[in-house]
Each structure stands twice: as structure tokens, then as C-alpha cells.
């Protein structure tokens, strides 16, 4: 679902834009809101999964991802859709590393583990292509809402199977989380990208362009320091 959702809405973007009145400049936030939240919180999500419990965070990630998908699928405004996509990214940042960690601890034999990671890699690699095809089919024969709602039954099935078949595990040691750092990096990326998008309408010398790009660079510099 994590990889699938990075591409499944691409074909549906024109329909979303017309239905929700999204401007050309803001249309990319359907994609960007998801990828920024996912990428910005991925390391933090992996650390939380390792120490809070991989199975628990995997299930929480699935439920949260399903809820965000449901919220986005029912969106009637662009703001709701953007927020839902960002929320999907947040829970994807928990779900993806938890899934990888579970594979690592479940398959202790090196050969079996290699096979499991091979299957995971194949599914992840094909997920983007499948997302484009599935997004086109759902948009053509249903509507764009289903490009998000399709995640709900998938997540429900995954939760039902995970509860009895996946065993809990967690790492030991230092459990400190760099939450301020993750938030700073994510906000910096969002501000920087937003400033770049404003350049299309206001120009590179526009007040908002300079303000948001400057704020983004400052936040990223703080994160690196």
C-alpha cells in the first residue's frame, strides 16, 4: 500500500482537480503532501517501531493508513484531501519500517530472509507500476475517490491476518526519539517545496516565495546542526 499510494492517484489528478477545484499550482500537493510526510518521518517511524513494538506499530500503521485513506476518499475540499494525504504519509512512515523489521526478525535463517526480502522488494518495485494501472482503472470505471478507498479493505485484511500470525518483537537499548529533529526536517522540506510552488505564480522575487524558501532553508540548517 505504501508504494502503491505514491502512484495510484497520478492518473486521478485531473479528476480530483476538476471535482475539488484545485488550482494548477496546488495540484502537486496531492502527491507532495504524502511523500514529504513519509520521507520526513521515516527514520523516526522506524525507531519507534523498533522500541515500542514492531507488531503493535505495524497494526497501528495499517489502521491509521486505512483511516487516512477513508478520510481522503470522502474528501469534499482540497484542504481535506491534502491533509488526508499527509496523514497517509505519517502512518506510512510507521508502517513501512515496521514491516521491514518484522521480516528481519521473523525469518532468522539467512536464505529464508533473503527470499522474504526478495519478495518484498519485488512487490515494492512493482507497486508503482500497479498503482498507475489500478488508478487508471478505478478512475475510468468508478471515480477518483476509489483510488484512496481501495486501501481500506486491504488494510482490514492485513490487520486480521497480522493479529494471529505475526509475533511481537522489540529492540533493546537507548529508546530516545529525536521527535524535534524529525518535525524540524519535515517542516523545512514542506516550507521549501511550498516556496518553490509559489514561484510559479508570484515569481522568484515574490514575498511568499522568498519567505517560505528562506524559512525552509533555515529549518533544514537547524536540523543538520
State where each predicted segment sits:
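Hydrophobic transmembrane-helix bundles of small-molecule transporters
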Residues: 118, 140-225
Amino acid at each position: 500500500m505504501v508504494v502503491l499510494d505514491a502512484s495510484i492517484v497520478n492518473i486521478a489528478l485531473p479528476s480530483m482537480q476538476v471535482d475539488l477545484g484545485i488550482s494548477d499550482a496546488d495540484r502537486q500537493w496531492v502527491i507532495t503532501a504524502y511523500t514529504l510526510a513519509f520521507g520526513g518521518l521515516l527514520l523516526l517511524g522506524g525507531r519507534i517501531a523498533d522500541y515500542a513494538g514492531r507488531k503493535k506499530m505495524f497494526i497501528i500503521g495499517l489502521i491509521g493508513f486505512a483511516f487516512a485513506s477513508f478520510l481522503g476518499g470522502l474528501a469534499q475540499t482540497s484542504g481535506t484531501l491534502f491533509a488526508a494525504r499527509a496523514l497517509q504519509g505519517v502512518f506510512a512512515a510507521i508502517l513501512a519500517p515496521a514491516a521491514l523489521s518484522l521480516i528481519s526478525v521473523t525469518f532468522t535463517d539467512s536464505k529464508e530472509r533473503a527470499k522474504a526480502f526478495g519478495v518484498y522488494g519485488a512487490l515494492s518495485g512493482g507497486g508503482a507500476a500497479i498503482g498507475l494501472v489500478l488508478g487508471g482503472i478505478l478512475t475510468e470505471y468508478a471515480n477518483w475517490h476509489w483510488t484512496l478507498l481501495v486501501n481500506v479493505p486491504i488494510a482490514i485484511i492485513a490487520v486480521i491476518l497480522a493479529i494471529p500470525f505475526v509475533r511481537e518483537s522489540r529492540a533493546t537499548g537507548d529508546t530516545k526519539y529525536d521527535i524535534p529533529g524529525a518535525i524540524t526536517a519535515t517542516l523545512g522540506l514542506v516550507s521549501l517545496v511550498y516556496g518553490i510552488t509559489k514561484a510559479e505564480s508570484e515569481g522568484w522575487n515574490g514575498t511568499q516565495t522568498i519567505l517560505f524558501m528562506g524559512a525552509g532553508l533555515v529549518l533544514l540548517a537547524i536540523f543538520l546542526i
